[in-house]
Design a protein with these regions (language model features):
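Catalytic cores of enzymes that engage adenine nucleotides and/or redox cofactors via long glycine-rich
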Residues: 64-212
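Beta-rich, aromatic/charged-enriched effector core domains that present basic-aromatic interfaces
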Residues: 1-111
Length: 212
């Protein structure tokens, strides 16, 4: 039997290719996410006003470190949850059988497993929680594990959502007055900054990086 040719292609669910990250890192004594993030903002024209960042600052992290008062966060919109279908239920049973000793639980699994469900979760975040995400993105409150977060990491990594559409949805919320700039910038920084940067570091410096 003849060999089957294998073609390796770039993952289209990241906006920075491995080559582009290597070019960014070339010649730098130290890698900083902030500088990479600014480069990505310029390249993809995200939250830009001409050649300058929207609002005059690249990073609004200083505005995004508030704590809840003594009464806590107050009303929190519910995040969409989904009843497992036949396929998902089968996978849950498989996990419970083969990986019973692993940490975690699938007893209350309700995450999106279809694109339409993932879009529903994204739109719920944009419409109901994004405006408050920035101020309290680092805050914690006992008994409230989700607060104003988006719950889309799994959907992104499973390719049910594309990072570009997530970023565009958040930026549109700012430009139409539905969410303030610090909240939108803080959220976009997680997607266009940290997610892309950590992936770039992984491909460039692993496995040695894990031992530092």
């Amino acid at each position: 039997v003849g060999a089957t040719p294998l073609e390796m292609r770039e993952d289209r669910h990241f906006l920075c290719s491995r080559h582009e990250f290597a070019v960014h890192a070339r010649g730098r004594k130290q890698l900083r996410m902030e500088y990479f993030y600014r480069e990505m903002r310029r390249r993809h024209r995200v939250l830009m006003d001409g050649d300058q960042p929207m609002g005059g600052a690249w990073n609004y992290d200083a505005d995004n470190r508030e704590a809840f008062g003594p009464n806590g966060p107050g009303f929190l919109p519910a995040t969409p949850r989904f009843e497992p279908d036949v396929i998902t239920q089968g996978v849950i049973e498989l996990v419970e059988t083969r990986f019973a000793a692993h940490p975690g639980s699938v007893a209350s699994f309700g995450w999106p497993v279809k694109r339409a469900q993932a879009l529903q979760v994204l739109h719920s975040f944009i419409d109901e929680r994004l405006e408050h995400f920035g101020r309290w993105q680092d805050a914690m409150w006992q008994g409230e594990p989700w607060l104003y977060h988006a719950h889309i990491s799994a959907a992104l990594n499973l390719k049910l959502l594309n990072p570009r559409e997530v970023i565009e949805a958040a930026e549109a919320a700012f430009r139409t007055g539905r969410a303030p700039l610090p909240a939108v910038e803080g959220f976009i920084r997680q997607i266009l900054g940290w997610r892309e940067y950590v992936r770039g570091i992984y491909w460039q410096q692993m496995p040695d990086y894990a031992q530092r």
